[in-house]
């Protein structure tokens, strides 16, 4: 099959494509991209379910750890203010985990941007392909209308002027037949006219979904960043209420991180299967949606020497007919104008129409060549399966770092806030200290009584 320009599956695609797949009954499933088949759908759902399994194991581990911490902690002697051994290690482990989470957030922002760039490249390729197809339809319609107008007006007028000379009328009628033949052949070149599938609509739908996906990830990243920063602030200020609130928020973000991880993993595996051999699926799907012949679709999607141009015969016949019209008009101008001066005006108008038609014809030849649309196809593949897939892998790394960091923080935070001094300890200050809040209050009352 013809490879689009720059079409090279990456090492990540090969690695993900080689991963084993199974359905809900744990039976092996082929790695070919077949989203319409139930077994393949179950295989992707099973990949996503692995993240749910990881979430369940994380919650069980955190629950067991916290229960052991609460139930098996030795009682502190009354009035003891000596910090328990290992308290500093617990706090620092929590801080390191949160800093690792911040690094993961940076990776997540980069991955989100890469994914958005890849989807934008896909949308741009679809818009460019839509422009090419619209230009073909417009040129065909304009040329056919111009030829029809010439047949109805100039050629009819010319036949009326040349009526005394039957051989000249026969030549004019020959030009009419050739013009009608050209119009008929050109109408068959607008292969996308009336097709229900619109690349413009697909691009708009893709952009619409991508906007909400990008926004959702930005909100998730910002939420985790705020949780990490406020947790660090609570640890620095030894604020129990802030740390408790951030612990609850960390649990929420942990669930969201595992959920996004499952979605990213399933999408990455599906994209790798698609990108390993995209041509058969794209050909079949486009043929189902458009109803176009496989010859036309194979010519544009494969674009190699093994597939001939399905419009070559129409283009050849149109070019020959235009050449015949040109020679007939030259003969009429040479024979008829000296005898019928009034024939010069319709002949000049016909020559002008012929020149415009030939110009449009050469543009159609260039637009109908497979290079342009095949290049758009390659750009769409590179955007979706290189940039977008790379971004998904970075988002997957972010979710993994986030889940690990938050799980560590959830285990460490309860032990950290247990080491915070109680609020009563702040009242145990020297009465002679001028910065003592109680002493400052008595000083203000003394000044007001003077």
Swiss-Prot record:
Pfam families linked: Tweety
Residue numbers bearing the Phosphoserine modification: 440
Residues covered by region (Disordered): 428-450
PANTHER family, A to Z: PROTEIN TWEETY HOMOLOG 1, TWEETY-RELATED
The organism's taxonomic lineage, starting at the top: Eukaryota, Metazoa, Chordata, Craniata, Vertebrata
Ranges per topology, Cytoplasmic: 65-88, 236-240, 412-450
Disulphide-bonded residues: 303-370
Assembly notes: Homotetramer; disulfide-linked. Homodimer.
Localization (cell): Cell membrane
Entry function: Calcium-independent, swelling-dependent volume-regulated anion channel (VRAC-swell) which plays a pivotal role in the process of regulatory volume decrease (RVD) in the brain through the efflux of anions like chloride and organic osmolytes like glutamate.
Annotated GO biological process: cell adhesion; L-glutamate transmembrane transport
One cellular component (GO) term of this entry: plasma membrane
Superkingdom of origin: Eukaryota
Family indicated by similarity: Belongs to the tweety family.
Catalysed reactions listed for this entry: chloride(in) = chloride(out); L-glutamate(out) = L-glutamate(in)
Extracellular side, ranges: 1-43, 110-214, 262-390
Name of the protein this chain belongs to: Protein tweety homolog 1
Topology versus the membrane: Multi-pass membrane protein
Chief location: membrane
Keywords: Cell adhesion, Cell membrane, Chloride, Chloride channel, Disulfide bond, Glycoprotein, Ion channel, Ion transport, Membrane, Phosphoprotein, Transmembrane, Transmembrane helix, Transport
Reported modifications of this chain: N-glycosylated. Contains high-mannose, hybrid and complex oligosaccharides.
Molecular function GO terms recorded: intracellularly calcium-gated chloride channel activity; volume-sensitive chloride channel activity
